Design a protein with these regions (language model features):
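Catalytic-site microenvironment of enzymes
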Residues: 1-252
Length: 252
C-alpha cells in the first residue's frame, strides 16, 4: 500500500458531496414553506365617495353637504374592511374627481368590487330611505326633477360601448345589491330601502360587480341629522361590510 493512501477516503468524499448537495437543494424548499407561491390574495374593493371639491352634491336644511357625508362613510367603511380586503378610495379628501375617472381607478386597480356612495336629494323633504342601484340600460324608475343632488344619479342618454362592460356583471351586481339590502334592513335607522336598475354613468364602465348606494336623503331633516351622527354612519358601514362578506362567500 503506497504512502498516503486511505481506503475510505473516496467513500468519505462521496458522502460529503452527497450531504452538500442535499443541503443546497433543501434551501428553496424551506423558503417555499415560509412564503407559499400560491398565497391567498386579498380581494380588492374600490370605494367611491361621491362628489368632492366644488361639486358639493345635495345639501340638507342644516347645510350638511353630501360630499362630506360620503367621504366620512367611505373612511369608516374602509377602516372596517382593511383587515380582510385591499381597499382603495377614489378620493381621500375634499377634492373634485370627474365621474369617468372613478371607474377608471377601479379598472386600473383590477378591483373585485366597486361601490359608489351617495346621499339622496329631493325638493320633497319627506322623501326618505336608502336606494341601492345596479347598472341597467333601461331605468326601472322615473328620475324626476325631484332629484336635487348635483348629478348623483347622472345617467347616460344612449347606450355606449362602455355599457357592455358593466352589462357582463349585471347578475353579480344584482346579487350584491340584494345582499347589501338584506343587511341594511337589519338595522332600523332608515324606514325603507329599495333596489333599482338605472343607466348610471358612475357605474357604466366598471369591469367588475358594481353598485351605487344612496344612504338616505340628506334633504330630509330627520335623515340629515342621522347622517351627521358618526354612530349611525358606523352602523351603515357595518351593514355594508357584512353584505360584502356575504357576497364573496356566495360567489367564491
Amino acid at each position: 500500500m503506497s504512502a498516503g493512501y486511505h481506503p475510505f477516503s473516496i467513500t468519505r468524499y462521496c458522502l460529503l458531496m452527497g450531504l452538500g448537495f442535499i443541503l443546497i437543494c433543501s434551501q428553496p424548499l424551506q423558503a417555499t414553506r415560509k412564503e407559499p407561491i400560491f398565497a391567498k390574495q386579498k380581494k380588492t374593493i374600490v370605494l367611491d365617495p361621491g362628489h368632492g371639491g366644488h361639486d358639493t352634491g345635495a345639501s340638507g336644511p342644516e347645510g350638511t353637504f353630501e360630499k362630506n357625508v360620503t367621504l366620512e362613510l367611505a373612511r369608516i367603511l374602509a377602516a372596517q374592511l382593511e383587515n380582510t380586503y385591499r381597499v382603495i378610495l377614489t378620493r381621500t379628501d375634499d377634492y373634485f374627481i370627474d365621474i369617468l375617472s372613478r371607474t377608471s381607478i377601479a379598472n386600473h386597480e383590477k378591483a373585485d368590487l366597486f361601490i359608489s356612495i351617495h346621499a339622496g336629494g329631493s325638493f320633497l323633504h319627506q322623501a326618505s330611505g336608502i336606494t341601492i342601484y345596479f347598472f341597467n340600460e333601461i331605468s326601472e324608475s322615473v328620475l324626476t326633477p325631484d332629484t336635487a343632488s348635483s348629478k348623483p344619479l347622472e345617467t347616460i342618454d344612449h347606450p355606449s360601448d362602455w355599457s357592455n362592460i358593466q352589462n357582463r356583471h349585471q347578475t353579480s351586481s344584482k346579487i350584491l345589491a340584494n345582499l347589501l339590502q338584506k343587511r341594511i334592513n337589519e338595522q332600523t335607522i332608515f324606514e325603507k330601502s329599495e333596489i333599482l336598475g338605472a343607466p348610471l354613468l358612475v357605474l357604466e364602465g366598471a369591469d367588475m360587480p358594481a353598485v351605487c348606494l344612496e344612504i338616505g336623503y340628506i334633504t330630509n331633516p330627520a335623515e340629515e341629522k342621522s347622517l351627521q351622527d358618526i354612530s349611525v354612519l358606523s352602523n351603515i358601514a357595518q351593514s355594508i361590510q357584512h353584505g360584502i362578506d356575504d357576497f364573496f362567500e356566495k360567489v367564491r
